[in-house]
Amino acid sequence: APDDYYDLVFVVVQAGQLPDVLPVLKANKSQYFVFVGNNPQAKQVLEFMQRPADKIAFGFQGTAGRREHDHVVSVYASAGMTVGGATTPLSGTFRTRLKTAFDGAKYKLTFYGDMDEWLKCHIAFVLPACYVCYACNGDLHRATKQQRGAILDAAYEACLMLKDAGIPVNDANNTDNFQPGTSARRKMEAMVFTMTKTPLGRLCVSDHAMHAVSEMKYLDEAFDALRRQTGTAMPMWEKLRNEMPSWDSLQQNRKAAK
């Protein structure tokens, strides 16, 4: 209800579901909101909420898992969240409020100054991995060496596209890791190999991709809109997209599996 007041409001829904809940959140008199999850449009959400930039945060929790019939299987190295403002650091007041909320919970908060950039760069890697997952019918063990390399090549292209779109990409944490021929790229190749050959890949990529087709489609459409604006050449990205089944068929298969 609009008159309900909370010290912190955590919004944990898929980005494509936000249009249904944003009007309700905007009408609420609470001041501090944290939108958690993959979101390619943090700046637009901030604008819609019509609140000061230091009252709206965006976060990403580094966990994974899947639903079984009667329970949830989850995996995490350590519980925590990367969190910050859409394009500016959170105020000291907001940081203190977040730290107080998780005090004693063994939950690590990593503050970041530009979460719109962070989230877009995260999606730049997530989507190519999902494209390959769909091409392999959810079984990343089937991914070839060429496909594993293509994930990183496509992520590199996506980072260049984001820079063309005016996004201040943190190259050290993103572009440099994907650039062919570098030591950082070789480390990423080892990580992707592990991701495709161990149960960790199923939990971190396959389960999410296969159970959240609508979310991935939404992210894909958001990135495609950006790509059309920039005109950046992304041949490997396009190749991976063309090798996966259509979004309609993936959604139909998902409905049939329920």
Where are the model-predicted features located?
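Rossmann-fold dinucleotide-binding core
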Residues: Q41-H122
